[in-house]
Amino acid sequence: MYLKDISDEQSIVDKWSPIFYLHSDEKYFPCSVDWINKNSVLVDHNTSPPTYVSPVTNMDLYNISKKYNFERRVSGDIILSFGKELYPGEQPIKNVPIYGLIRSQNGKIYIIYTVMFARNGEYSILGLADAGQHPADIEQMVVELDENTGELLRVFYGAHSTWVRKWVDAKNVPMEDGKIVAYMALRGHGLYERPGTVFRLFGLSNDYVEKGIKWQPKVKLIFPRDSPKYVPAEMGWTAFYGRFGGTTEKGDASGIVGAAEKQAIPDTDASKYHPPVIFSPETSEYLFMIKDFVILLIVYFIVFGVLRLTDKFIVRGPAGSYEFKDHVVTIIIFYALVQIYKKFGHFMINKYAPS
């Protein structure tokens, strides 16, 4: 067996720990659980009056989850709340750890690396609106090894929904100085195996990935809650099923749920995922030019069509004659179309491209 004892476990998570490249324009950086806890308030709205705990410890997170039988709480009755001042993340980034957990399944070892953030940033909807932002973010990368030899088999790059997650075979995994490389998307933090523009949801919520800021974090070893090596005072956050992020208000469900769920092995069937196309940085530049040109054409023909309709059905003047009234009506109609487009973009991103 490749894995024998706890000393092996720490050395294994260290050996396969990745190098991350963040986008050079990133403004929401990673953070540690301890940093989040000491700057947060844990709220339980199921008591009367509500119970507030601050600063928070891992033992607090474990105890409140145990109190409610480790049930998933999504309604905003239990919240680990923190303010916007934490959104930029913890500095210096070189001191921020990631978390590594080892599981075995079907003759394979899975190392689950977890990265924490205080903020998931916004997506720009073709430059007209932003959507997808929310407090807190947890990203996952999984390394699959042969249980007997320790040979690298695959790497799972976690990125948002199943539509963009991907298992990458060992031969195609990027390496640098013997380390696996993962590229982190701008603001949304999805992980990918190479830089470029990730085409998502028909271009509505693209991810932008580049070889920008290098981050090679140390790994804190954690264990599953059912393991005899599990230490609640150090790992209690992994048992937390309440809302991670948001205000202290009852019913605030703006934060995420799932710190505990991020410790599971993802579906190992690669066919279950639908990874998007990643365009190279060079190709992306041309695509942006084409996209901007297409948007201008669309706007032009919308305005042109509205003007003609205004002339025909409202003004009823000679063809091609547009007066002040026509332009006012055109502006109003066009503004309404833009608002509809923005609402549609928000709906599509939140429903089909969750962050």
Show which residues each predicted segment covers.
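Single-pass alpha-helical membrane anchors
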Residues: 290-310, 325-344
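A domain-level signal for the mature, folded cores of soluble proteins
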Residues: 1-137, 150-289
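Juxtamembrane boundary at the C-terminal end of a transmembrane helix
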Residues: 344-355
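Short beta-strand micro-motifs enriched in acidic
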Residues: 144-148
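Non-membrane alpha-helical secondary structure
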Residues: 4-8, 28, 320, 329-332, ...
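Membrane-interfacial hairpin junctions
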Residues: 310-324
